Amino acid sequence: MNKSYKILLTGSVIAIGAMGLMANSINSREAERKEINTGPVVQAEGVASKNEEWYRYYPREYDSWKQTKKSDKITDLLREKPQLAIIWAGYGFAKDYNAPRGHFYAIQDNINTLRTGAPTGPSNGPMPTACWTCKSPDVPRLMDEVGENEFFTGKWAKYGNQIVNPIGCADCHNSQTGNLGFSRPHLGRALEASGVNLDEITFQDMRTLVCAQCHVEYYFRPTEWTDKTGKTKTAKVVTLPWAKGLSAENMEEYYDEYSFKDWTHKISKAPMLKAQHPGYELFSKGIHAQNGVSCADCHMPYKQQGSIKYTDHNIGNPLDDIASTCLTCHRDSEKAFRDRVASKLERKEQLMKMAMDTLAAAHLEAGKAWELGATEAEMQPVLELLRSGQWLWDYSIASHGSFFHSPEETLRLLGVANDKGGKARIKLAAILAQHGLIGYQVPDFSTKEKAQALAGVPLQKLITEKKAFESTLLEQWNEEAVKAGRLDPKTLEGMSNKSSWSQTELSQ
Amino acid sequence: MNKSYKILLTGSVIAIGAMGLMANSINSREAERKEINTGPVVQAEGVASKNEEWYRYYPREYDSWKQTKKSDKITDLLREKPQLAIIWAGYGFAKDYNAPRGHFYAIQDNINTLRTGAPTGPSNGPMPTACWTCKSPDVPRLMDEVGENEFFTGKWAKYGNQIVNPIGCADCHNSQTGNLGFSRPHLGRALEASGVNLDEITFQDMRTLVCAQCHVEYYFRPTEWTDKTGKTKTAKVVTLPWAKGLSAENMEEYYDEYSFKDWTHKISKAPMLKAQHPGYELFSKGIHAQNGVSCADCHMPYKQQGSIKYTDHNIGNPLDDIASTCLTCHRDSEKAFRDRVASKLERKEQLMKMAMDTLAAAHLEAGKAWELGATEAEMQPVLELLRSGQWLWDYSIASHGSFFHSPEETLRLLGVANDKGGKARIKLAAILAQHGLIGYQVPDFSTKEKAQALAGVPLQKLITEKKAFESTLLEQWNEEAVKAGRLDPKTLEGMSNKSSWSQTELSQ
């Protein structure tokens, strides 16, 4: 081998090596590019319902989501606003109604509320399976596994050992792609019914619509279906009443046409509607929505960790972090924002209290009228006013922050709700007089205890039964879920199992 | 003379000439600078009340001001909203009430309205001199000449031949400097009473406050004074009730403490308050004021004529020129603005109608209760609710565009106003029943004619008298004013002398 050949060889080897390194670098960059631009597959098929499984791919998002655990305060709204127990007499909300807590508590709160009762086995208890619909990524997993009709058939207790992970990743993200998407079919159907072309939904739209899967008005529509064995069953399918539009009056017309009622009022006998939480609907009437702002823009601001930008999943009150939320668009001091929002809240609180007082008094006066022998014909216009007025009131305030999302629409609705309640009371004064009672003063409903007594809520019995349920069937559910690998036992750690009634002393 | 001397001389002459020209140029530039930076003296002393006199210095502003003559449509609000005649029964507004027209018609409308009656000489007629206060730059001229107490003493007809120029230049501009300034002392006093340091008012503040001289709530406070001859007289002094604050509730408290009433309601006998037009007060609760926007920013946008920038004095609806108003700050389409404003108006119209219907029915029911022998003690709480509810209603809608200036405050107030009216009606249903009448239906007030008949308005008599006044005393006033050089006769040219009643056929 001569020297020049050696040099040539060495050069060639170096060149080949360098090319190899370059190719390797190109390949690894291409892999990196793919990784950055493609969400990882958390689970190859179906729905990855355990939030913990998303941690390895989305550690920042997961950690911020877990911060919702800190939003753990129980605020007993029946104690703060006892009128509610009168207004909802005969319905679950008169039993127990708290201000919302973080997403982390969705399962715990659903189990703890006295509204879901104390089942002793999979086929009893007051509530249908539909009551789980918005509580957990186990819901889309189950819908995927058993079908939507089967999911919506049966009692709430049917899925006690299946639905165990609180609202989390797979509620809004596809487990194969990580992309935002609907996990609940009811929203897509409702959007189509209200004229939306699903193919034209943008990413920015989606940053609102994934929230709108749950933060909306809905009802449980009885739907007949036939199972594989040919047996006819009735599913109670979560349905959004959007076919006539999204306003309170549109939905009222929808429900009226369908002769739908949620319950018959225990005191006034009015055929009532219960608004759930039409947050998306009210938001869409407000100035932020009109300017293209999404839910996530304010409730899930972008955050920075080192060089990584991510979305904060500690969904809560944007006022907790004005610098990352309001101030990204508006120029003003934090104080100015707080004062402005406070005055909006104050106005709504005033009109809300006014309407609640009117409606509660009207229900009690209607009860008295029945007691004195009022006729169906006399009472019919009163009951219609009560149904309509209370619906408008409920629609306007049942969702988070309606006073901010759409302050003018909220105030308008509260004004009209109160007017209808007032008109019912004017009629009732005449009906009562007709039956010999002039100037009737309704009984005192100024405390939760007094109001629940008037509403006939057997609170102590409900608590006793709930406690028995929690120490038996609930423990069994959790054990089964852990054993089957559906629940990470760590999820239950450090949960104080708080409720409005855990400190209530029971009389012997 | 040698040649070099000649050259020297010629050079010197040229240099001196050039220096002279330069000095002249410097002087004329200095004069120009002064002229640009100093408003001209329209009149050496006192108030230049004839708007025509300002034309030579401010031709663009004058011409744009004169465009307010085009805003000449008469909208009879008693015809559009007949409830008003019931609500104001016993007070001037039940006689005649139109939507506002351009500043140019301030005098004509004040003379034409049936509210100012038909005086036959300087010391009779229903109204005090105070009713001229906001109508003309002749008012500050007169106050300057006779003193404020003398101005506010006597009947409206006292100044019929003095107050002849419609709202114009000297209402907001100083005749010696052209600067913005208060021409009415009541505003300065009210600002001081509400804690404002007048020395800290900025130019931008002034672009709102000159409007606030008139677009505010006020009342005529009886004030004793002694004239030069030692005679004690009572002036009715325009006073802004701001000492407790600017909200509706603040002012209500002020009036209650002072046991003030504007009139006793003819049907219900309630001691009523009439809101004037608290536009500044409501505006100051809204988002535009909170962001430092002035009245002039939207109602008097800057315009360009060649290289000259001037302020448009054709004060009217900013929606007539969205490009020069809203769009200087906001980015959106004109259509988006129109739709947004329309929905604000719609909400306010709904709650306003609701409250008016409730209040009108309550007044009529109260009238029936008195008729059936209700006692003062029974009626007292009803009358208090009527006074308070109607005040809140009136405060919320009496000014221009409250639905836009402060939509949330307007809706809140309408909701509370309606609630108070409703509570009065509930009490009245019991009082009527107590006096043997159950389920009373109030008489029909669905047209202006029906409502005015219920309110006891002698419309034909009022029109006949007004026509007589206009063909006698009014003509005399105008002749005297022209003769004394206080009125340019051209001002009256082309005025169609429109009113709500000019086309009303009188029965023989």
From Swiss-Prot, chains A, B:
Transport among keywords: yes
Keywords tagged on the record: Calcium, Electron transport, Heme, Iron, Metal-binding, Oxidoreductase, Periplasm, Signal, Transport
Binding site for substrate: Y218, H277
Span of the signal peptide: 1-23
Amino acids binding heme c 3: H103, C211, C214, H215
SUPFAM superfamilies: Multiheme cytochromes (SSF48695)
EC class (word): oxidoreductase
Keyword Transport: yes
GO term, biological process aspect, one: nitrate assimilation
Protein known as: Cytochrome c-552
CDD domains: NrfA-like
Domain of life from the UniProt record: Bacteria
InterPro entries: Cyt_c552, Cyt_c_NO2Rdtase_formate-dep, Multihaem_cyt_sf
Binding site for heme c 2: C169, C172, H173, H313
Residues binding heme c 4, per UniProt: C295, C298, H299, H405
Gene coding for it: nrfA
Span list, region Disordered: 485-508
Xref: Gene3D superfamilies: Butyryl-CoA Dehydrogenase, subunit A, domain 3, Flavocytochrome C3, Chain A
Residue numbers binding Ca(2+): E217, Y218, K274, Q276
HAMAP family listed in its UniProt record: Cytochrom_C552
Binding-site positions, heme c 5: H288, C326, C329, H330
